[in-house]
């Protein structure tokens, strides 16, 4: 086992030997040919979208991990895509909403278990406004949505640790502004 929740490689992709092991220095190395493979974090985006009551838009996950639990809208950044483009694409795909403004807030590391493998992600969090909330429609990876006051949401209903951490951050920053 390694940091990914499974044995990632059985054989070295360069020489084919069975000596391809995960090192304590966070990469895979073949003890036969010396090939090194670095498996870095994947980037993901998260949107904080509020309604006129300042409630935060939470989605309901339609797939595992954490199927049926609360999440914040967003998703993985595709290869060759900017975080900003991924943010706009994911919000359109999941909720049929068009972003008209966004502001970077913070990052949050995450472990995303899927298919027997643990993906390490870095979630880039943005405060967003949309052109028209009336166009909202759950789609793609989202089975539903709810607007909830960030101070009233039960963090036990949130499926991913990084999202719970983001909610805690929002609570703390809003409390300090009062």
Q: Predicted regions: what is each one?
A:
Residues 20-21, 38:
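Short functional micro-motifs and their immediate structural scaffolds
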Residues 12-15, 30-33:
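Short cysteine-rich clusters marking metal-coordination/redox-active sites
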Residues 2, 51-93:
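Conserved Nudix-box catalytic region and its N-terminal flanking loop in Nudix hydrolases
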Residues 106-134:
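Active-site-adjacent beta-strand/loop module that shapes the phosphate/pyrophosphate-binding cleft
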Residues 32-56, 76:
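Conserved N-terminal beta-strand and adjoining loop/helix that marks the start
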Residues 137-167:
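NUDIX/MutT-family hydrolases
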Residues 5-9, 26, 43:
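Short metal-coordination and nucleic-acid-contact micro-motifs, chiefly zinc-binding Cys/His arrays
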Residues 21-27:
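Short linker/helix segments within small regulatory modules
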């Amino acid at each position: 086992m390694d940091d990914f929740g499974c044995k990632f490689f059985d054989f070295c992709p360069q020489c084919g030997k069975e000596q391809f092991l995960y090192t304590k220095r966070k990469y895979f190395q073949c003890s036969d040919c010396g090939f090194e493979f670095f498996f870095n974090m994947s980037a993901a985006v998260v949107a904080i979208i509020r309604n006129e009551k300042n409630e935060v838009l939470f989605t309901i996950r339609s797939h595992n991990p954490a199927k049926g639990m609360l999440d914040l809208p967003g998703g993985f950044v595709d290869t060759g895509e900017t975080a900003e483009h991924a943010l706009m694409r994911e919000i359109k795909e999941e909720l049929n909403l068009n972003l008209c403004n966004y502001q970077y807030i913070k990052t949050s590391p995450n472990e995303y278990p899927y298919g027997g493998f643990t993906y390490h992600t870095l979630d880039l969090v943005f405060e967003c406004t949309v052109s028209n909330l009336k166009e909202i429609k759950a789609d793609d990876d989202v089975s539903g949505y709810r607007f909830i006051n960030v101070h009233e949401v039960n963090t036990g209903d949130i499926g991913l640790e990084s999202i719970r951490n983001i909610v805690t951050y929002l609570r703390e920053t809003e409390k300090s502004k009062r």
